């Protein structure tokens, strides 16, 4: 993800970058080493994630360009950014899609880029969305334990147990939206033109098939 972002933002001038759903800040810390003039802002709805990000930030030699804030993006207000990055978040955000897309466009400067990872609108993902809705309707502790057992087998040696426990919740969350022609048209109507796409490898059969899409803010279509 870092290299994709670096391939679509200028490195030789001061830019503002926002990471929506930044978690503990790992992507921004890696970008900071390659974007020496950038101001890097991370927001996450989890105060625990932001606390961890700020702890990592305090341990770094140079932290002036890194900012972290616990915030819901739909209520977040700031000066426009040159780039917005969101990895596996937009498809989970509740609410009306058009309003979300318009906010993304409004938070970008002219010529700014949006780098987003989302599941594709395809039959495989649609099937898993149905499964997740069904699981959510019958969720109980035994099912959580069974999902965790399966995850341990699938990710044996790849992920620690705490990380696997955190991911159990995602098996009950169907996507609110998926990237396809209809959603791309919604982005275009808000002035965000699709510029590039990069497929991503799934880490398990239960993961939605997804990719990275790059949008550039231009003129709003009539």
Where are the predicted features?
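Conserved alpha-helix/loop element of class I SAM-dependent methyltransferases that forms part
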Residues: 1-13
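Class I SAM-dependent methyltransferase "Motif I" SAM/SAH-binding loop
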Residues: 21-25
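Class I SAM-dependent methyltransferase SAM/SAH-binding core
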Residues: 26-74
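A short acidic, Gly/Pro-enriched loop at the edge of an enzyme's catalytic core
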Residues: 76-84
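A short SAM/SAH-binding and catalytic strip from SAM-dependent methyltransferases
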Residues: 83-96
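A short glycine-rich, Lys/Arg-flanked "PGG" loop and its adjoining helix->strand segment in the class I
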Residues: 98-110
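Conserved class I S-adenosyl-L-methionine
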Residues: 115-146
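Short alpha-helix
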Residues: 173-190
